Every structure is written in C-alpha cells, then in structure tokens.
Amino acid sequence: QWSSSAASDVYKRQPIEHGAAIVMHSLTKYIGGHGTSIGGIIVDSGNFDWSKNKSRHPNIWEPDKSYHGAVWGDAVPQLTGTNIPFIIRSRVVLLRDLGSTLSPFNSFQIIQGLETLSLRIKQHCKNALKVKEFLETSDKIEKVIFSTNQDSFFKENADKYLKEGKGALIGIELKGGLEAGKSFIDNLKLFYHVANIGLSLIHI
C-alpha cells in the first residue's frame, strides 16, 4: 500500500484513489521542474488500518521513549481525531532527529515550479511521444523503451493508471552495445548528462 512516484506522471495518477495508503514523491523532478532544489514529500492518506498486525508496526504501537512513552497509534487519533500516526511521527520524530526539511528559499523554488506543473506535465507527455516516434525511425537504435510499447513491462499499468498521459521517460538501446553507448554519451553537445530527470531542461 505504498507508492513511490518519483518518475511517474504526477499530475493525474493519484495513487491513493487506487489503494495506496502512503505516497512518497520526489519534489526535485517534475514538481520543482528546474533542478535547483532537492526535496521530497510524504502524503498519508489516513486510510491505513494500523491496528491490524500491530507487531508489524512497532514504531506506531510501542511506547516512544523520546516522547515520554507516547504510543503514536493511540495518541494521534485521540488528540487530532485523525488516523495519521505515520505522518505525525515522521514529522515530530524523524524531522527532529534527521533535520530533513527544506529551507525557506528551496521551499519557495519548489512552489514556483508547482504553479506550472499541470501545463508542464501535459507538454512533457506530448513531447515524449514525438521523441519516441522519431527515435523509432533511426537505424542506429536497436530498441526504444516506452510505457506504451506493446512489449513494455509497464504497458498494462500505464494503460490502467496513466489516463492523462503515459509519462515522459524514454529509454533506448543502441546498436553496437556498450561502446556505442559510451560514444553516444561522450559526443552529446545539446543534452546534459546528469542524474536528474523530469525538468524543463534537456537531460539524458
């Protein structure tokens, strides 16, 4: 009942509607859209029954010594009237212990990207289809990997969950194997070879 959505269509997928209880998403990719800030988000649907199999969730049901013995599974519903002990514990314990929070400036940058998310995702998906179709005409490419391909491992799920666009990630297998791939990367002039994805920039 978890959904890790870093590389998927963030605009219309809505994993909670399909049964996910907790959704984790990278803010650095499509949401930020500009690659200037690193961040992530956790969304707790409040739909998960933490009372079942309590032994599997000791962080929720065992007394937390760092909070005077509080039992999050009991305390959060009593104090807030909500079923979100996971996200409350994440905020007050993990945030306290790890300091994993955005600075005000990085938060501002993420919000700036969020304002144009719906427009960018639609265009990302349209562009990806065009690029896929173009790459399929190249005699230097062995295979184009995309979620809509009939032989794609992801096609069934893409058709089921990605109603407003099939995502914007494209993979290719070059003829010539590893050496051809190295040569391709080394000779890029327009594209940047980076680890990040989902930006309004040209990356590979």
Please report, for each region that a protein language model flagged, where it lies by residue.
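As written
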Residues: A7, G19-A20
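Single conserved hydrophobic/aromatic residue that forms the stacking wall/gate
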Residues: Q1-A7, Y11, I202-H203
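Conserved protein kinase catalytic core
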Residues: K12-R13, I31
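Active-site C-terminal subdomain of aminotransferase-like
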Residues: I22-L169, E173-S200
